[in-house]
Amino acid sequence: MPTIQQLIRSGRSIKASKTASPALEKCPQKRGVCTRVYTTTPKKPNSALRKVARVRLSNKIEVTAYIPGEGHNLQEHSIVLIRGGRVKDLPGVRYHIVRGSLDTSGVADRKQSRSKYGAKQPKAGAAAPVKGKRR
């Protein structure tokens, strides 16, 4: 605990808040190029093959980003858009790839939460999505 004299001399320092996604540099999204697309396994107790990509951003920083949704068309040299948001069971993955923008296709046959996965509205002739459960 500082003395009164020490507080007069220097005052209390304000603790700087640390950002969860430093590579974005206060931008909502950043563009990047995939350098490697691969699968990795999550922490215990989960078990899966999670799809991730190593991305070199436009500010020359290289990050690991998660590819959400079922199936993707990404490969090396694909241009992607990155947003913040970590994946809890993948250590070191702090970013998500935005589906349906730049070289990333939207998730095919997606009926619900379409805007999060870049899926277009299904055609009127096709089976309409169920609005609410009827009893």
Swiss-Prot record:
SUPFAM superfamilies under this entry? Nucleic acid-binding proteins (SSF50249)
Task: Tell me which Gene Ontology terms the entry assigns under biological process.
Answer: translation
The keyword tRNA-binding belongs to this UniProt entry's keyword annotation: yes
Q: Name one GO molecular function term.
A: structural constituent of ribosome
Q: What does this protein do?
A: With S4 and S5 plays an important role in translational accuracy. Interacts with and stabilizes bases of the 16S rRNA that are involved in tRNA selection in the A site and with the mRNA backbone. Located at the interface of the 30S and 50S subunits, it traverses the body of the 30S subunit contacting proteins on the other side and probably holding the rRNA structure together. The combined cluster of proteins S8, S12 and S17 appears to hold together the shoulder and platform of the 30S subunit.
The family assignment reads:
Belongs to the universal ribosomal protein uS12 family.
Q: What is this protein called?
A: Small ribosomal subunit protein uS12
Q: Which organism is it from?
A: Chlorobium phaeobacteroides (strain DSM 266 / SMG 266 / 2430)
